[in-house]
Amino acid sequence: MRGLLGMFLLLTLAACGGGGQSEANYVGGDVALECAPFARALSGVALRGPADGWWDEAAGRYQRGFQPEAGSVLVFRRSARLPYGHVAVVSDVTEPRRILVTQANWVQHRVTADQAVIDISPGNDWSLVRVFWPPSGGMGSGEYPAYGFIRAGRAASREQIAQATPRAVQIALKQ
């Protein structure tokens, strides 16, 4: 019964969040969860290890590319700000150079849903991105190098990703 009540509360809180970019896009409360276990649970891309290693680990196992699709995993390169890289699941492609992602630990101890990421690379190849920063309510000023996108096998809709997010949090917390 307690589990059902908790799930109802999570779904109710998620429903309260509008389409805007604000704290309403936080999923649940504080969670001690890294990006990789969460992305693995949400996307089905069964890779292990630090996020920056996912690109090489995916070779020969998953399709890799430079065009986003919902359900794929955006892999950030290691950088001064991201010493282990970062991974985020694409929840929607809104424009050719703008996507929404659902991710863990971009904001420490938080899962954020439908956060904007824009391609600022000179070659329009998603090799350099800027990410929405929820605490400020706007796009972050940092520029982050990225490898590209890993596809799990089939695309997912934004609604499917939103519905799967609370369960992915629970799965990732057990890993």
Language model features with spans:
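Sec-dependent signal peptide recognition
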Residues: 1-9
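Alpha-helical interaction segments
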Residues: 6-7, 44-45, 139
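C-terminal motif of bacterial Sec signal peptides marking the signal peptidase cleavage site
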Residues: 12-15
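Bacterial signal peptide processing site
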Residues: 17-20
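Secreted/periplasmic proteins that engage bacterial cell-wall peptidoglycan
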Residues: 23-89, 94
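Aromatic- and glycine-rich peptidoglycan recognition patches
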Residues: 97-175
